[in-house]
Amino acid sequence: MARLSSLLSFSLALLTFLHGSTAQQFPNECQLDQLNALEPSHVLKAEAGRIEVWDHHAPQLRCSGVSFVRYIIESKGLYLPSFFSTARLSFVAKGEGLMGRVVLCAETFQDSSVFQPSGGSPFGEGQGQGQQGQGQGHQGQGQGQQGQQGQQGQQSQGQGFRDMHQKVEHIRTGDTIATHPGVAQWFYNDGNQPLVIVSVLDLASHQNQLDRNPRPFYLAGNNPQGQVWIEGREQQPQKNILNGFTPEVLAKAFKIDVRTAQQLQNQQDNRGNIIRVQGPFSVIRPPLRSQRPQEEVNGLEETICSARCTDNLDDPSNADVYKPQLGYISTLNSYDLPILRFLRLSALRGSIRQNAMVLPQWNANANAVLYVTDGEAHVQVVNDNGDRVFDGQVSQGQLLSIPQGFSVVKRATSEQFRWIEFKTNANAQINTLAGRTSVLRGLPLEVISNGYQISLEEARRVKFNTIETTLTHSSGPASYGGPRKADA
């Protein structure tokens, strides 16, 4: 009995220690008395673009447990495939292009419409040009057709089989892209203007088994400037992961000659991680998303191979809050994009006109990182001590981190203010201070009157004068002349 009691005591002590070491890895990191609008601290230049990195050691980003990166890809620029050890949520701030991800699934895009799989073909999962293969539905149509299929397979192989690869998607301004840890991803700019993509990396995620440093793993190319993301590390050129293996091992693994294996290592390549494509970029391109019918999905049928990873937040007709004279706000969570349930991230897109204001609110269960894509706004943020830790302008290209529970209000000071917020919860929730669904609206008048030492009539005005839920005008106090029609 004594032995059992000692074992239980040891187990409880161990659990307490492990929980404490995890939860308090960075003690007092969120005792912030000042926030700042942040700019990139490092720039990695490449042949056809650049990668701009924010300092994730900045106190407000360290509190949120995230890192932030901006990719600027020039026309005909190809961001070479890479992966991170963290979950990543990206937003296309400008431009259009192509995106590919590689997960542990068979290739589903094939560029030869005449190809039919024969019995001994290694490409038995082919489904035709630009189509996705989901199983073995086209692997034979009965015993009587096997001979014909074999002949077709031999004919097509004689004609030459060009390529098959995993899914490629068109991306455009407003797209939000979710990416699992360890999933290789590439981008190509097939437009005429720069393709700008911003990404948040959840360093504090349970899926990141390394330290709180963003670590890109490159499958191709080299980074001559080294890993500027990791503080204290001597900046040596960062090579792709194939460079670490001997050419002989690569030759055996890929069934190629040693010379080709050496080329895979990119040892003499100083173009960086964004290279310029010479000539046409021939990949299998699916129909544009606007040409495909909208389908109702519940996420239950999705697998890692078929899961949607992209959704567009720039369509006002799909907004959660829309007022033509003020603007709109759209949210993206795991109900809209089920993959976010595993990433434990979500996003909010806002676009408001001059003098429109987002009513004071706080994130109940998430940290938020606000990135300005267009225009300017005046923002105030208040911490748990009731101190105003930020009171100033934010403008295009700047970043502001808003910790959980910190109250924030935004007012557009330019003709239009647009931003994207990344949040560290798959279903982030907000509470408002003013408005129809606010915390003060839910309190009894007596509580408001006694709590703020105001009359019942003043308490009634505090509680009921603002009938909007999210967006309102900031040009002056509301009119008290009569009832107003409630809207968003």
Swiss-Prot record:
Residues 1-23 form the signal peptide. Residues 116-163 are annotated as: Disordered. Disulfide bonds join C30-C63, C105-C305. Keywords: Disulfide bond, Endoplasmic reticulum, Seed storage protein, Signal, Storage protein. InterPro entries: 11S_seedstore_CS, 11S_seedstore_pln, Cupin_1, RmlC-like_jellyroll, RmlC_Cupin_sf, Seed_Storage-Functional. Residues 121-147 have a biased composition (Gly residues). Residues 35-262, 311-460 form the Cupin type-1 domain. GO terms for molecular function: nutrient reservoir activity. PROSITE patterns: 11S_SEED_STORAGE. Belongs to the 11S seed storage protein (globulins) family. This is a seed storage protein. This is Cruciferin. It comes from Brassica napus. The lineage of its organism: Eukaryota, Viridiplantae, Streptophyta, Embryophyta, Tracheophyta. The gene is CRUA.
